[in-house]
Amino acid sequence: ESNSKWADSWNWGTSASDINDNMNLVLQHYLEEDNYNGDMDSTQPKSDNAYLDGITYHGSDRSMASGMDAIDFQMHRMFGNAQNAYNFAVNNDQYYNDATYSVMYVDSHDYAPEQPDETTRFTGGTQTWAENMDLMFTFRGIPCVYYGSEVEFKKGELIDKGTLISLENSGRAYFGDYLEGTVNATDFSEYTASGTVADTLASPLSKHLSKVNAIRRAIPALQKGQYTASSTYVTGGDMSYVRRYTDDNTDSLALVSISSGATFKNIPNGKYVDAVTGDVKYVTDGTLTVPELAKANMRVYVCCASGF
């Protein structure tokens, strides 16, 4: 509580009277702050900190931030289907002071997404995992990967059943055996490995994770940018959006499309290079079209025009 009017009145006693006083205080606080008139959209505080102004980056207003940036529990629960998680975020980021600070994750030591089964390590499949990682590493927010997910470690195992199952047979089992061996890194996502860890790093999802991580690291717009999914700038894609970040030394713009084609409109003319395939497109009419993509495939066209 940041309002001293209420914080200073809180009673830290444990008697029935103390508890009753605090309950009444909570009710009084609620009634005083409540201005709900039947239309949540008109009364709920909103923020544009995560959104581009058109396709122009703007500074963030953190004046209403609580200081308690969140793990993105809502997206987490919906990551059984990446598009559901994405749609929720696009429609609700306005209710967070700055969703670019949200930590995105699929699973954790407590829960998997609601579908297929939140009580077990995620069993949605390798392709769904890859699609989720595409979104996590190119959308707003901070990606977070739970240990072992890059090899679908213990998928289908109950995450926790207390003393009723052994730790080894749970989703919280020891992962160290997968990391035995040697890794020599020469640069970000560039390495040689031997032993069991080499097999771990050679798994399809590990390779995919390394790729999307390297793409994110190379493109400032993906690391720190705001986004827009407005139909003024992109149509036709299930998960397609424009990312941009600008500071005194950087102007980074990227066009992202995941698992479907899309048409980007009203964008700067010039050269665009796809960070995934290396494909080059030259835009002359403000429009760039991405052909249809299969699930978990992605294109990230980076603007290399003059000034970028």
Predicted regions and their residues:
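Active-site-proximal helices and loops of the catalytic beta/alpha 8
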Residues: 1-98, 102, 125-126, 132-135, ...
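Active-site clefts of carbohydrate-active enzymes
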Residues: 98-122
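Short, flexible loop/turn elements at secondary-structure junctions
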Residues: 107-110, 140, 259, 276
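Glycine-rich, aromatic-lined ligand/substrate-binding cores of catalytic
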Residues: 108-111, 125-126, 135, 144-147
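A generic secondary-structure signal for well-formed alpha-helical elements
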Residues: 109, 113, 140-144, 155, ...
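Short, solvent-exposed loop/turn and secondary-structure capping segments
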Residues: 115-118, 147, 156-159
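Short, polar loop/linker segments at the starts of domains and inter-domain junctions
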Residues: 117-126, 281-292
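C-terminal beta-strand-rich structural cap/linker in extracellular carbohydrate-active enzymes
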Residues: 254, 284-308
